């Protein structure tokens, strides 16, 4: 093999293959059971109030908080394992003969939204909201993002406060820099002048 042919082979070996795909690093979700929380699927188009209404209809004695994952899934979090397990058995459609903590079960119907069909199981630590999930939410698209509404209200309140001014500003009056030239002259003229008698009394006291 001559030098030219050998050099050509080496150059071809350095050219990357366009058809090959780079190695992708897959993030493996943590499947460890989180026994203080229940994973509820099928909550599309339901508000947090409606989800809690479903929970309280069958497990009213158990206080819970809602952790949203996406439009279709959420976690129902309880104080401890026993409360969570008790709520799970109250929410399942039919008590299974052989219960498995790993399986997902059909729930009882929503009391006011019977068309909803839920699936419930123990939550896992990998059941978390992805970053910027609100940007892909269909629920926020139709009903609005409460965080944006809160920010708008805060801006509006701040703007109104700036227009009205603070109570201290009302007591002190406008700043001198905010007054026009004529207003400054008028304000100086309004200041009371001391009489000659007052001046004489001060001199006599000295």
UniProtKB/Swiss-Prot annotation:
Compositionally biased residues, Basic residues: 187-206
Report residue spans for region: Disordered: 147-206
Q: Which InterPro entries would you find in this protein's record? A: NCBP3
Where would one find coiled-coil regions in this protein? none
Q: Where is the composition biased (Basic and acidic residues)?
A: 159-173
GO MF annotation: an example? mRNA binding
**GO CC terms:** cytosol; nuclear cap binding complex; nucleus
Q: Specify the protein name.
A: Uncharacterized protein C16C4.16c
Q: Which GO terms describe its biological process?
A: nuclear polyadenylation-dependent CUT catabolic process; nuclear-transcribed mRNA catabolic process, nonsense-mediated decay
Domain of life from the UniProt record: Eukaryota
Q: Name one Pfam family in it.
A: NCBP3
């Amino acid at each position: 093999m001559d030098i030219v042919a050998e050099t050509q082979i080496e150059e071809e070996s350095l050219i990357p293959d366009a058809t090959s795909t780079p190695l992708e690093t897959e993030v493996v979700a943590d499947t460890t059971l989180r026994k203080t929380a229940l994973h509820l699927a099928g909550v599309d188009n339901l508000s947090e109030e409606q989800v809690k209404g479903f929970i309280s209809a069958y497990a009213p004695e158990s206080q819970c908080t809602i952790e949203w994952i996406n439009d279709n899934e959420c976690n129902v979090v309880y104080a401890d394992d026993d409360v969570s397990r008790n709520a799970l058995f109250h929410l399942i459609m039919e008590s299974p003969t052989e219960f498995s903590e790993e399986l997902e079960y059909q729930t009882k119907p929503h009391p006011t939204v019977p068309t909803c069909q839920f699936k419930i199981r123990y939550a896992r630590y990998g059941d978390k909201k992805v970053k910027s999930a609100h940007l892909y939410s269909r629920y926020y698209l139709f009903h609005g993002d409460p965080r944006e509404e809160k920010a708008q209200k805060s801006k509006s309140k701040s703007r109104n406060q700036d227009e009205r001014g603070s109570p201290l500003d009302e007591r002190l009056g406008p700043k001198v820099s905010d007054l026009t030239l004529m207003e400054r002259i008028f304000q100086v003229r309004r200041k009371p002048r001391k009489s000659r008698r007052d001046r004489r009394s001060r001199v006599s006291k000295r």
